Amino acid sequence: YCNVLRNSPHEAEVGSNAIEAMTRGGYWSKSSKTATNEYRISIEGNPYPHALALTNPVGDNLNIKRHGFTGPLGQLLSLKYTVYDDTNEKLFTVVDGGFSNMPRVALVIEHKEVAVLDYGLNRLEMKCITNIPNYSIKGNFLFGDYDIFSQREVRVSSVTVLQCDKQSCFSIQVFDKAELAAAIGIPTAIALLRARIEEHLE
């Protein structure tokens, strides 16, 4: 599911009537290139089209450039949002592949893919915390048999990357585990919300 990031398909500008990217107030450390970064991503849809909202680093003015990835037949495969600060320094990139049957979002920092989120519910909020830009996360987030047209809402409080030698674990912490399990109808929901991290080979 990460192929859209690795195959470098043709990039085309997306018109203003496409999915909108919005910024809201949030936390950011100006020296965060070597420190721990915090972002929150909100994906909303009914189920399509959906909007991608990014937290705004400490209220700074951000320049968001939106591009569309197109396939060999010209079909829109995904959207890429590249976020710059007011000095035109690249902060991070979000790739939204939500135009397939299984929507997905990838967060890319300094050309390193550090978090990939597959989602199918109407709304999912995620906060990614990472300080290992040289590692790439691979794997699916399994939500079981859910209805992507439902109006149910699931909130994920945080995503934490824990490194253990070369084998790392992608751990998700949830505000209310019972509420999450009930929302997706799977008692073992928390156990399924995992992915493996493999060392970035590029």
Specify the residue positions occupied by each region the protein language model found:
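Low-complexity or membrane-interfacial segments used for flexible interactions
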Residues: Y1-K80, D86-L91, F99-V105, I109-E202
